């Protein structure tokens, strides 16, 4: 895990920051996107299909990470085949935190592909957005890998961010002030919002046919991610 930051700096030195960013983004941009989970009822009724979609995404990301390691010697954390197989048995479709993890993983992966495809030579803002998207996906994978998605504490958030090496990239752009919005927003997402809601989707109301609580939580998550991005851009400008 700690190799991410070190390898990233080595790649910058070997290829040059801009050249490496263009190479890495070009490589990642070739990977496919997957259908995002946007409907609560569909998520619950077609649970096994949706989880299959998630595991497919994890397998493709694993191939992506292995390719990045092979071609650029950059370590991206990923789940191995055994860990991916465990995801299906670990996730409970009616648990709030599990639903959030499943929904956001594919969304964030797709955001990474989009960010890679939007990288333009000389456009430093597109470079920043690309590395932010990459860091978010790595963070998602760590949450799943360490099985802390539904019991995250403020202390663990700092540890996990450090393990991704993502803070190194953020520091490069925004300095130490860029770390605060990352920690506070991530903590709000993973601790405040998840813990404030019922642990089971169906416990909220007998009449919740569309399980709207999951949609609202997903919107809050996406809003927080956008806040993270905007704050980083503010301190980077």
UniProtKB/Swiss-Prot annotation:
Name of this protein: Uncharacterized protein MJECL37
Superkingdom of the organism of origin: Archaea
Record lineage: Archaea, Methanobacteriati, Methanobacteriota, Methanomada group, Methanococci
UniProt keyword list: Plasmid
């Amino acid at each position: 895990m700690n190799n991410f930051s070190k390898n990233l700096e080595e790649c910058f030195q070997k290829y040059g920051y801009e050249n490496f960013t263009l190479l890495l983004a070009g490589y990642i941009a070739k990977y496919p996107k997957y259908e995002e989970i946007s409907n609560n009822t569909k998520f619950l009724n077609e649970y096994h299909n949706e989880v299959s979609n998630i595991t497919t995404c994890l397998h493709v990301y694993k191939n992506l990470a292995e390719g990045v390691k092979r071609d650029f010697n950059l370590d991206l954390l990923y789940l191995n085949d055994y860990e991916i197989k465990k995801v299906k048995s670990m996730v409970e479709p009616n648990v709030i935190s599990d639903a959030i993890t499943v929904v956001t993983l594919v969304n964030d992966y797709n955001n990474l592909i989009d960010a890679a495809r939007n990288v333009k030579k000389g456009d430093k803002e597109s470079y920043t957005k690309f590395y932010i998207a990459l860091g978010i996906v790595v963070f998602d994978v760590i949450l799943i890998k360490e099985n802390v998605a539904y019991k995250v504490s403020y202390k663990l958030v700092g540890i996990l961010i450090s393990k991704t090496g993502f803070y190194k990239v953020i520091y490069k752009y925004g300095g130490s002030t860029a770390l605060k919005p990352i920690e506070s927003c991530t903590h709000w997402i993973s601790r405040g919002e998840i813990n404030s809601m019922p642990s089971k989707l169906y416990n909220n109301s007998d009449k919740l046919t569309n399980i709207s609580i999951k949609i609202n939580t997903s919107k809050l998550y996406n809003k927080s991610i956008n806040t993270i991005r905007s704050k980083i851009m503010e301190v980077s400008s």
